């Protein structure tokens, strides 16, 4: 089986794209099938190579790999062949209305309470009328086979049916000779043997038309799944909505697996759960769990998931990334992973555990810190050093609770709050602990 993800390279990947790509990928991998990446770049004015590169980079970052890829712009000759075949068969016809004339017709139909379906007037033009339009380049429509009930079994929505009388003949080629989405898409699906098409519910009416096109070309009909659209604050998500691109999510410090864990489950009957490997998402994937109801997207939910993903990642998962902080110790990661919201927070903890941290010692605490220095147990700092140290200190001071712990934390970390010092001390090490506690002496 083969699925495909077909973004238009007219902008960056937004969250709606990510969800579709991920679901297509998971479906293919679950079935041991293939995942095809197709760039719908027939809009030559808006499509850009830089967006193709960025989309590829974003998918790689998200751990979504593809088995093959191509651009529709490389297949125009093939589209022309099929176009000419359908034209010869009388299934495509030229039209000459301007945009203004089409808009006028649409408004008049709506005013009369009629559906704004194209009236097929171009099919009834006399030769004399066609001659009048000789200076106008035509655009072309596909001729829908009317009086037909178009049905398919959607894996998300169940049985879906359209009466072809309620469908307007779609424009498939523009005045400038470029193609719209409709025809190239089904030619590619046919030629590349795409067996399963998963996309947003905004394509449902397109599916009805494309099924007729596939019948006209005597091609197999793929299995369709139409996902509910993502909404955020009651607005449909699109690439034009700010703050919802992969680039934005990267800037928030989100982990790829936090994003994948979230989008693999929202809009399904299953709760969102933490996964650090794509194989876990593959094992739990089931297209039939997706709901038809609108799916609410909330970036705050992904942000809350991010620390849980980090906490679940092993040292081997992050070993290479830690090298940029000169960290090679598994014990450091095992301690820090439960105390960070995003990976870049590592920098702060690396400074705390290195010699770059400047202690914070108040004037009223200098004598107490010197006492604490003298009470520090001898030898290597271990997991039990903190408890032994505090026990020694308490025997020589009346300080208790925060009056005892806060000055020590400030001197050792520069912070008034944080994780257990008992676990942190071995990472700092005896030499550095002594340096920090001695800081008041050199002021």
Curated annotation (Swiss-Prot):
Signal peptide segment: none
Residues annotated to bind ATP: 239
Pfam families: Anticodon_2, tRNA-synt_1c
E.C. no: 6.1.1.17
Compartmental location: Cytoplasm
Molecular function via GO: ATP binding; glutamate-tRNA ligase activity; tRNA binding
GO biological process: glutamyl-tRNA aminoacylation
The entry's keywords: Aminoacyl-tRNA synthetase, ATP-binding, Cytoplasm, Ligase, Nucleotide-binding, Protein biosynthesis
PROSITE patterns linked: AA_TRNA_LIGASE_I
Top-rank taxon, per record: Bacteria
Entry keyword DNA-binding: no
Reactions it catalyzes: tRNA(Glu) + L-glutamate + ATP = L-glutamyl-tRNA(Glu) + AMP + diphosphate
Gene Ontology cellular-component annotations: cytoplasm
Xref: Gene3D superfamilies: 1.10.10.350, HUPs
Motif ('KMSKS' region): 236-240
Motif 'HIGH' region: positions: 7-17
UniProt enzyme class: ligase
Biological function: Catalyzes the attachment of glutamate to tRNA(Glu) in a two-step reaction: glutamate is first activated by ATP to form Glu-AMP and then transferred to the acceptor end of tRNA(Glu).
Family, similarity comment: Belongs to the class-I aminoacyl-tRNA synthetase family. Glutamate--tRNA ligase type 1 subfamily.
Binding partners and assembly: Monomer.
Protein name: Glutamate--tRNA ligase 1
Organism in which the protein naturally occurs: Ehrlichia chaffeensis (strain ATCC CRL-10679 / Arkansas)
């Amino acid at each position: 089986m083969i699925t495909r993800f077909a973004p238009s390279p007219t902008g960056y990947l937004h969250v709606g794209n990510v969800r579709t790509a991920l679901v297509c990928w998971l479906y293919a991998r679950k079935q041991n099938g293939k995942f095809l990446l197709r760039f719908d770049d027939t809009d030559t004015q808006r499509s850009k190579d830089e967006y193709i590169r960025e989309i590829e980079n974003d998918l790689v970052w998200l751990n979504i790999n593809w088995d093959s890829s191509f651009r529709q712009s490389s297949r125009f000759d093939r589209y022309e062949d099929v176009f000419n075949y359908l034209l010869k068969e009388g299934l495509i016809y030229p039209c000459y209305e301007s945009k203004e004339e089409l808009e006028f017709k649409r408004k008049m139909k709506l005013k009369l309470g009629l559906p704004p379906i194209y009236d097929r007037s171009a099919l009834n033009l006399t030769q004399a009328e066609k001659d009048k339009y000789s200076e106008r380049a035509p655009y072309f429509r596909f001729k829908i086979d009317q009086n037909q009930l178009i049905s398919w079994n959607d894996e998300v929505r169940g049985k879906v049916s359209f009466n072809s009388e309620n469908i307007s003949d779609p424009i498939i080629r523009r005045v400038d000779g470029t193609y719209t989405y409709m025809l190239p898409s089904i030619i590619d699906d046919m030629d590349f043997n795409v067996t399963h098409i998963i996309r947003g519910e905004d394509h449902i009416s397109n599916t009805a038309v494309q099924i007729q096109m596939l019948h006209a070309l005597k091609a197999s009909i793929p299995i369709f799944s139409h996902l509910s659209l993502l909404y955020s604050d009651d607005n449909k998500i699109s690439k034009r909505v700010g703050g919802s691109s992969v680039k934005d999510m990267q800037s928030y410090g989100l982990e790829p697996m936090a994003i994948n864990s979230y989008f693999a489950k929202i809009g399904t009957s299953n709760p969102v759960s933490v996964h650090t490997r794509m194989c876990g998402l593959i094992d739990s994937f089931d297209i039939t769990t997706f709901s038809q109801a609108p799916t609410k997207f909330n970036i705050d939910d992904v942000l809350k998931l991010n620390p849980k993903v980090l906490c679940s990642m092993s040292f081997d998962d992050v070993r290479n990334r830690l090298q940029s902080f000169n960290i090679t110790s598994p014990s450091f990661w095992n301690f820090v992973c439960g105390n960070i919201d995003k990976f870049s927070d590592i920098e702060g903890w690396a400074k705390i555990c290195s010699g770059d941290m400047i202690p914070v010692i108040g004037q009223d605490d200098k004598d107490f810190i010197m006492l604490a220095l003298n009470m520090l147990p001898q030898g290597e700092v271990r997991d039990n050093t903190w408890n032994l140290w505090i026990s020694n200190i308490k025997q020589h001071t009346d300080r208790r609770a925060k009056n005892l712990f806060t000055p020590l934390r400030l001197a050792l970390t520069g912070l008034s709050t944080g994780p257990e010092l008992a676990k942190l001390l071995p990472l700092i090490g005896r030499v550095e602990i002594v340096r920090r506690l001695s800081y008041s002496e050199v002021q």
